[in-house]
Structures are given as structure tokens and as C-alpha cells.
A protein has these predicted regions:
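A short, N-terminal "cap"/entry segment at the start of jelly-roll beta-barrel domains
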Residues: 1-50, 62-65
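Short, charged/polar surface micro-motifs in flexible loops or helix N-caps
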Residues: 46, 53-56, 77-81, 89
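Short, conserved beta-strand element in jelly-roll/cupin
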Residues: 67-81, 86-88, 94-107
Length: 109
């Protein structure tokens, strides 16, 4: 998972073909003008999920993880923070699709 801003995207070029495709798309299209929901860039290989998320404080945070896809998180409005942990906890709920959440007391923000 990569969490960063648009201005730093080129730092991640060359890591992976599909990531390069996503970066090239985001650098040539205004992410703030994308419709909410899924925008396909290269079918199932590269797509963008645009959401208007409800932000939470760093208390009670549940780390997100993915089994199939890499995740590039961009904060378009400049109001989101991220946390991480190197000590994942137990899985919360049923893992469906590609996204799951864990209960972890060691999240660093």
C-alpha cells in the first residue's frame, strides 16, 4: 500500500507496470473530477475507486489490507492522515473481495 500525495507520484514509477499505468493516468486526469465509484483504466488490472470517505480519528483505527491488489491511497483534499502497523492483529469480520480489516492495538499515526 502506498499512501502519498499527487505531487510525489513519480517517485513510485518503475516499481510495477500496473502501478506505472495508474500513475500515468492520474498525472493526465484530474483525480478530483473523477466520479465517485469505479473508473476502469485497464480493466481488472488497473482501476480507480473514488470515494468521499468519512474520516476518523486515530483512535479505534482498523488497518486495511489487500490480498490481490496493490493499493495507492491519495488524499485529494489534504485532510486525511494514515496509520500503519508492523504487528497486525486478528481479522475483523469476513474477508470478502480484496479488502479486509484487522484489529490492532499497535497502529502508529
Amino acid at each position: 500500500m502506498i499512501c502519498d500525495t499527487l505531487q510525489h507520484l513519480t517517485r513510485y514509477k518503475g516499481l510495477c507496470k500496473n502501478l506505472d499505468t495508474a500513475i500515468d493516468y492520474l498525472l493526465t486526469h484530474d483525480p478530483a473530477s473523477l466520479p465517485l465509484g469505479r473508473t476502469e483504466v485497464d480493466g481488472e488490472e488497473v482501476f480507480i475507486n473514488t470515494m468521499d470517505a468519512t474520516l476518523h480519528s486515530d483512535h479505534g483505527y482498523h488497518p486495511e489490507y489487500h490480498k490481490k491488489y496493490a493499493d495507492l491511497q491519495l488524499d485529494i483534499t489534504g485532510s486525511e492522515g494514515w496509520g500503519f502497523t508492523t504487528n497486525p492483529g486478528r481479522e475483523i469480520g469476513d474477508f470478502t473481495g480484496d479488502c479486509g480489516f484487522q484489529d490492532s492495538a499497535s497502529v502508529v499515526t
